[in-house]
């Protein structure tokens, strides 16, 4: 799951990449955050260094947003990475066909979480976090850092809790 300051890689910053991974019988998370705008490429490098041990990527709408955004940033920084060696599962793409059957207003991750009764601890939207990140870069604070990490952690946790919906997929 990525957090960015906008929807277009050309004019926005990728400031946080969060991953869940399964090891020794349980789920763990890792979060890679750019503490300044200049560290963006370092976060991407650290992500690919971490991901090279894995072959599968599970994401929520990553085919349409996360993966293209990261690849555009790789181009921008002339980084030699791609997702060609990975197999992926886009939870959004797999669940969206059931939107009307489930009587959902949309297939946003937070909507699916509410449908499943999953509680989030974070109170900010991704859009609200943009300002919090810009404030954090100028004047780092524990509040801002915690808000940024918590939102991403809840997104990751939510994806893991949405995964069982795929057991009904044909």
Q: Where does each model-flagged region fall?
A:
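Short His-Asn-centered micro-motif
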Residues: 2, 59-62
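Conserved RNase H-like, two-metal-ion catalytic cores of nucleic-acid enzymes
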Residues: 1-53
